[in-house]
């Protein structure tokens, strides 16, 4: 049995249910190894697994099913009717569903049709399962990260005075694609000068000038898995104050890395970095969390913020 389906059947059994139904694109990818824009996956507690698709995805689903073992079903008239047939066939009485991502309208339509089935909230349990990556997932994430890093180093040759943020951001996306990225993890953030104070700023027609910081926030994807990197460089001659700020942020980053270990609270890792900044009264400018988990989603699982109750696990 495909490892991710095996893990899912254990979750179903632990929750005392008969099956789980998945609509979320990332959750479906976790099971079927690609990202259809629409579809339904049902997995039973015994491991019977179904992937319901429309004709746009039948061939792709069948190719991936050779690895996953999913039974591919092409809809005849509606997803709901196909789901109803499977629920009756498998005698599903308690069905886990994605209560945090499904729309109210979709829930109501399924609950009305499957009126003899109890819907049980999945909550965070599926994401908690996804948090722990299998070896093959780690390799895919490494590949995405390597593509992003290689592309960044290539882009540096093009970062020159007079180039605009938009121009370089577009070039960056092209270089990542050329190096094997399936797409960007998120809209590339490339900012210069005073714009670098905005953690999620949007590239503009602003040109790079001598003495600027240039901020890069970017990621590549590979077979559905994301990477996320942030880098800052200086152009030409910069002030002593800018050098001090750069060194302070680097020191804070290294303190966070040192504190990062299995069993450590995410909030404590954040605090380790914050304390370094606050030594120079710069903590008030730390407006963003220290970091977050990545995977099939760009923000997945852990969040290293002061309010997080999570602990890092191996």
What do these predicted regions represent?
Residues 1-314:
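Active-site neighborhoods and metal-handling regions in enzymes and metal-associated proteins
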């Amino acid at each position: 049995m495909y490892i991710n389906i095996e893990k899912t059947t254990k979750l179903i059994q632990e929750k005392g249910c008969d099956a789980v139904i998945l609509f979320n694109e990332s959750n479906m990818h976790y099971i079927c190894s690609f990202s259809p824009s629409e579809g339904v996956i049902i997995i039973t507690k015994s491991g019977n697994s179904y992937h319901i698709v429309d004709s746009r995805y039948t061939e792709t689903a069948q190719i991936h099913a050779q690895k996953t073992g999913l039974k591919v079903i092409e809809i005849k008239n509606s997803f709901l009717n196909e789901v109803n047939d499977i629920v009756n066939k498998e005698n599903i009485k308690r069905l886990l569903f994605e209560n945090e991502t499904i729309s109210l309208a979709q829930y109501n339509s399924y609950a009305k049709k499957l009126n003899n089935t109890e819907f049980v909230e999945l909550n965070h349990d599926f994401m908690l399962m996804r948090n722990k990556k299998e070896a093959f997932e780690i390799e895919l994430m490494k590949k995405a990260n390597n593509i992003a890093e290689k592309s960044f180093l290539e882009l540096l040759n093009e970062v020159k005075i007079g180039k605009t943020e938009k121009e370089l951001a577009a070039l960056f996306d092209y270089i990542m694609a050329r190096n094997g990225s399936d797409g960007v993890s998120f809209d590339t953030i490339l900012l210069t000068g005073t714009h670098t104070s905005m953690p999620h700023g949007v590239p503009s027609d602003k040109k790079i000038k001598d003495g600027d910081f240039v901020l890069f926030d970017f990621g590549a994807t590979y077979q559905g898995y994301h990477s996320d990197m942030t880098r800052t460089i200086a152009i030409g001659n910069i002030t002593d104050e800018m050098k001090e700020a750069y060194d302070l942020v680097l020191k804070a980053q290294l303190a966070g890395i040192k504190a990062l270990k299995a069993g450590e609270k995410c909030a404590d890792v954040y605090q380790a970095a914050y304390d370094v900044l606050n030594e120079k009264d710069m903590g008030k400018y730390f407006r963003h969390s220290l970091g977050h988990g990545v995977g099939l989603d760009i923000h997945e699982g852990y969040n290293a913020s002061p309010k997080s109750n999570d602990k890092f696990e191996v």
